[in-house]
Every structure is written in structure tokens, then in C-alpha cells.
Amino acid sequence: MLIKFQGKTPQVGDKVFIAQGAKVIGEVELGEDSSVWFNCVLRADFNFIKIGKRTNIQDLTTIHIWHREPNDKGYPTIIGDDVSIGHNCVIHACEIKNRVLVGMNSTIMDGACIEEDSIVGAGSVVTKHKKFPPRSLILGNPAKVIRELSQEEVDFLKISAQNYVEFKNAFLKESSVTQKPIF
């Protein structure tokens, strides 16, 4: 469901799938071929969320921002192309670059940045303002770099995202859900 908030309507690219029960609120931009799965909440009420092409946000994930205030520009949430966000994650006011896999039940906090071609392992907690280099395997609570990813692991990241493009295409073929904004 697309929900307009304070004059901002979510912007949805071509061939995007938003599953039943998902809520996309306010200043959200969803790139072409992306998918937002069942019971996700993307709430861009007082800052923006931008999601790139071929990115999948899996079931029960929450994506939010840090509010803009008079003396604080806050943090938007920016997610790149070919990103897979696993089930039941919390992605809060951070940046995730291209070709990243965030494992199930992970949390990424305000001001953190995951550089391209990286994996955040299931259940990891990336704390505020933490920055990780490209090609990192990131695990733990608090999360830390365990090692650099192999080329085979990096290649898998794009395959994972492409699998979800195919899954969402199958759902789009059979789905009777309307994607019209709610005013």
C-alpha cells in the first residue's frame, strides 16, 4: 500500500512489486524492478528513503529515517542497486551501497555505511556511524569485519538480487493487488 504523507507520495519505478500488507509511506523512491515483500514498512515521514534498481526488501523488514530538525539535517536511508535485505531486518537512517546482502534479523543503525559488494551476516547489529569497506564479510553484535569476500561470494550477490527479480515477476503476473496511492 502506498500512503501519501505531508504532501509526499511514494515514487515507484517500472515493474516494482509491493506485496499485500506492505506499507510504503511518504518520501520513498523505489527503483525499477525492485520488490517490497509481505508486511514490510518503509516509513519516510520526515526525511527520505531511496531504494535502487533490482533491490529486494524481504518480509517483515522495517526501513525508517532519522528526522530532520532545525539544527540537524538528520539521516535519510539510501539503498543501492542489486541489494538483498533479508527477512525481519531493521534498516534505520543509514546507507547501503550496491550489491550488498543483509542477512535475516540484522539491524543497521543511524549514520552507518555498508560499502558495495559486502555481506552483513544474519542477526548482526551495525551500530551508529560505523563504516565498512567494500567486499566485507560483516558479522556480530556489535558487527565487525571478519574478512574480505572472495570473488565467488561477490558474484553471488548479484545472482541473489536477480533471483528476487524473477520471484517478483512471478508475483506480478498473478497478483491482483492494486498499487494506487492512498490519499
Give the positions of each predicted feature.
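Structural signal for interior beta-strand "rungs" in well-ordered beta-sheet cores
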Residues: 4-133, 137-138, 143-145
